């Protein structure tokens, strides 16, 4: 939730944050928490699969946790591409005065295996980021 403006909005609407350092294969309580929040509030699940802001040309593989959540909860995934890396780089770097584009992409239906899901998600988001750059 540490993305300027967008992160503040996510916090304001009551989004939950998954602390990567505390999440292990043995500690699956966060699945229960996520499932309860989604079912009670009818809110979407938003995952930042890179787990950090990246520079515009960075094509690092997405984290496997996104696929794990998708598979465990058996839910639709609505990919969102945000090109904020060129405006708000990581902490300590100079910010620029430019426009950020947020693109909501075609949903990915449940049922894909983890590898196919990650490949589909990466292709969807990265092709959109190339377009909105």
List where the protein language model places each region.
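Non-catalytic C-terminal accessory region of glycerolipid acyltransferases
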Residues: 28-133
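Catalytic core of membrane glycerolipid acyltransferases/transacylases, capturing the structured
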Residues: 1-23
